[in-house]
């Protein structure tokens, strides 16, 4: 390349030495800013009105464009470089609050707002001149930035919508997904409560629902069968009993409750009597109870939480069995097993078991 430059310079006969780095930009060699115009298609012809209103001159030219004497009265943005940029039809523009036009975004870079507000890529509408007459191009109101689908709002009487309005409406359309507060803590609590969900007491809402269903069932019975002579079912059947666990003095107090309206059987473990008589200390007192409804055809098994660190074991835990008719409850019996959940070799040792008939307990 240097050899070619030397040959060209020697052929031209120029004796002035050229700088070694001619293509390096320095403050003394900064070129004029020039926006190249977009070349029109060879088959399209511009109208004479538009050709007169859109001068295709470069901003790097030294001379100014000729203008009429009364042109300054109606325009306040007469600048050769801005006019050169605004004369290009493929650059979007917007009307400012002061009444003159400005570029919507730089032709070489994109603003952050346009990146945030940008939706799916769509062909950019062509803009018409600020002072030009009506043409086939889109109006300035459509050049305020890409808008999402939504109800159209009327424009201000002084002109189209401002770009600030379009920017202010952007975060509403591009709302980011936020993680709810306390999500991790709720997940941790849910993991702990999942293990105890089977043995927790039924909430007051369920009790109210049972009471409501039980109160509605007697009222519906006479209306459905007014000629039946059978007495309406009571709201709920409640009873308390004791289950002997097979060892001397070991027993378990429980309460049974059956609601015919909801067909739900609830067994509440109240307390254990003399279950840990031979335990050396409160630290070794750990017990778990399991309940099984028999006969095996309708066997349902549930397990209680571990009760420990107390010689007076107070359970106060509920076991709910849904979908049981009155005839099934009359034939069912509950079998209770108590196992040691302590440490060492005694872990899992059977402390006792017993069985109680629900029909005899609830007097069905």
Curated annotation (Swiss-Prot):
Tissues expressed in: Specifically expressed in endothelial cells.
C2 domain residues: 248-364
Alphabetically ordered keywords of this record: Nucleus
Region feature Disordered, mapped onto this chain: 113-166, 194-234
GO cellular component, one term: nucleus
Induction behaviour: Up-regulated by pro-inflammatory cytokines.
Primary localisation category: nucleus
GO BP of this protein: positive regulation of acute inflammatory response; regulation of cell adhesion; regulation of vascular permeability involved in acute inflammatory response
Subcellular localization, as worded in the UniProt entry: Nucleus
Low complexity: bias regions: 215-232
PANTHER family: C2 CALCIUM-DEPENDENT DOMAIN-CONTAINING PROTEIN 4A (PTHR47226), C2 CALCIUM-DEPENDENT DOMAIN-CONTAINING PROTEIN 4B (PTHR47226:SF1)
Family, as annotated: Belongs to the C2CD4 family.
Known function: May be involved in inflammatory process. May regulate cell architecture and adhesion.
Protein name in UniProt: C2 calcium-dependent domain-containing protein 4B
The organism of origin for this protein: Homo sapiens (Human)
């Amino acid at each position: 390349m240097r050899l070619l430059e030397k040959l060209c310079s020697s052929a031209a006969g120029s004796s002035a030495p050229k700088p070694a780095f001619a293509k390096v930009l320095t403050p003394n060699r900064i070129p004029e800013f020039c926006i190249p115009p977009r070349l029109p298609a060879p088959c399209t012809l511009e109208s004479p009105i538009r050709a007169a209103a859109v001068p295709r001159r470069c901003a790097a030219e030294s001379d100014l464009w000729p203008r009429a004497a009364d042109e300054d009265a109606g325009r306040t943005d007469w600048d050769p470089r801005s006019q050169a940029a605004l004369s290009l039809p493929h650059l979007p523009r917007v009307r400012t609050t002061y009444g003159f036009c400005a570029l919507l975004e730089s032709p070489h870079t994109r603003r952050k707002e346009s990146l945030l507000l940008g939706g799916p890529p769509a062909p950019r509408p062509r803009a018409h001149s600020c002072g030009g007459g009506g043409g086939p191009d889109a109006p300035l109101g459509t050049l305020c930035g890409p808008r999402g689908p939504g109800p159209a709002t009327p424009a201000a009487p002084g002109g189209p919508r401002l770009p600030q309005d379009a920017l202010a409406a952007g975060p509403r359309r591009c709302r980011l997904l936020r993680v709810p507060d306390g999500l991790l803590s709720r997940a941790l609590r849910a993991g702990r409560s999942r293990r105890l969900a089977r043995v927790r007491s039924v909430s007051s809402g369920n009790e109210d629902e049972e009471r409501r269903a039980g109160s509605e069932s007697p009222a519906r019975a006479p209306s459905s069968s007014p000629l039946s002579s059978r007495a309406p079912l009571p709201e709920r059947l409640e009873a308390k009993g004791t289950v002997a666990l097979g060892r001397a003095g070991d027993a378990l107090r429980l309460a049974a409750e059956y609601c015919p309206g909801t067909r739900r059987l609830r067994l509440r473990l109240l307390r254990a009597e003399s279950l840990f008589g031979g335990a050396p200390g409160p630290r070794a007192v750990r017990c778990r109870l399991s309940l099984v409804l028999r006969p095996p055809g309708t066997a349902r098994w549930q397990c209680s939480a571990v009760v420990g660190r107390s010689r007076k074991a107070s359970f106060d835990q509920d076991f709910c069995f849904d979908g049981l008719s009155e005839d099934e409850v009359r034939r069912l019996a509950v079998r209770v097993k108590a196992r040691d959940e302590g440490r060492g070799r005694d872990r899992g040792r059977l402390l006792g078991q017993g069985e109680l008939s629900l029909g005899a307990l609830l007097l069905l």
